[in-house]
Amino acid sequence: MEPLHAVMLTVSLFVLTFFNPGANLFVVVQTSLASGRRAGVMTGLGVALGDAFYSGLGLFGMATLITQCEEIFSLIKIVGGVYLLWFAWNSIRHQATPQMPTLQQPISAPWYVFFRRGLLTDLSNPQTVLFFISIFSVTLSADTPTWARLMAWAGIVLSSVIWRIFLSQADRKSVV
């Protein structure tokens, strides 16, 4: 696969995850509704930092794995592809709305409380790391150059920040 195609496919698959409600989406929206837009932005930036960490770990850890042991990488590609198919199937099949946890921080907490909430929500979500490994095992190869990996990482981080800031606007009244 051409490096730019790999970058576009990697970022596109990540962006598709935005439309599947999960813990990261709910923590940003809930915080925005309960504590305001600024708190939601800080929570979203915490989630985006978690995405940056896991995607970087996946992108560059996967590169090491690819070069060291092709058999393990082939197994990860198969398992990753099956996981992505299972994830898509369950997303289509189950349209239930998860329960949102109750907000435990006071409404007027310092910025770092909200940032930490977003970061810990993302880092404690095992689905995040599994999804990144699955995406990278399908879209990257041993030949994918470092610049393409860096572009994919930057695209993931940028799209994560933009999406989380968009979600933090939940406290505003919708305009039809």
Model-derived regions, located:
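Juxtamembrane transmembrane-helix termini in multi-pass membrane transport proteins
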Residues: 2-74, 134-152, 156
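Membrane helix-loop-helix hairpins that form the core translocation module of multi-pass transporters
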Residues: 5, 38-114, 170-173
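Alpha-helical transmembrane segments of multi-pass membrane proteins
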Residues: 17, 83-91, 137, 156-160, ...
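Transmembrane helix irregularities
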Residues: 19-20, 123-124, 162
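Selected transmembrane alpha-helices and immediately adjacent juxtamembrane segments
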Residues: 118, 122-127
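Transmembrane alpha-helical segments of integral membrane proteins
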Residues: 160-174
